[in-house]
Amino acid sequence: MKALVYTKPNELVYRDEPDPAPGEGQVLIKVEASGICGSDMHAYHGHDPRRVPPLILGHEVAGTVASGKSKGERVAINPLMTCGICAYCESGRTNLCTARELIGMRVSGAYCEYVSIAERNLVPIPDSLNLVTASLAEPAACSLHALNKARMHSARPLSELRAMVIGGGAIGMLSALLLTSYGCRHVTVAETNGLRR
């Protein structure tokens, strides 16, 4: 398959890589769309020691199932791989699994033609949702998680509050959009980067 491989700081090489071989409980996904996360940019610039080259980056992804019983289904991928058996996983708090790994961090990510991932990490998407939009499911989930935490700890509904989102990147803007969809009428986005203002 073709892949965009991070080979050293400030260098990506488009080259042939072996097709991933799905393990037990995994399926092969044909990547149709992949977002560029700010963390991928940090890695590209050499500011993330956890991402050791050579590595295929990318964890915001949507595509089509290419193997298994769901072959042909359109999906977004939850890029967080977990053990599935610890107390955190069994209670639905997979983000706290101590064995968690993120695709594109230490294992191959989605800047390629195919990625293998556990079938439990697939999120079916309707035909009405385009795959580029679906690839934003992961950053949208991060925003929604923060918003749900705020709702849980607030004594008043969001529609009665003023909100400030610090940072106008993708997650910040998604957070602002979600806040307004929850009825928050006073949302301010604070951003120091002049290119984003």
Where are these regions (language model features)?
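Short Gly/Pro-enriched turn/cap motifs at secondary-structure boundaries
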Residues: 7, 18-19, 52-58, 103-107, ...
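Mid-domain Rossmann-like dinucleotide-binding core that forms the NAD(H)/NADP(H) cofactor-binding site
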Residues: 130-197
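Glycine-rich beta-strand-centered segment in the early N-terminal region that forms part
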Residues: 18-34, 47-87, 126-128
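Cytochrome P450 core scaffold surrounding the K-helix E-X-X-R motif
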Residues: 39-45
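Short Fe-S-cluster ligation motifs
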Residues: 62-69, 113-136
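Cysteine-cluster motifs in flexible loop/terminal segments that predominantly coordinate metals
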Residues: 37, 79-123
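Residues that mark the start of a beta-strand
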Residues: 2, 26-28, 161-162
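Residue-level recognition of beta-strand termini and adjacent short loop/turns
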Residues: 8-10, 23
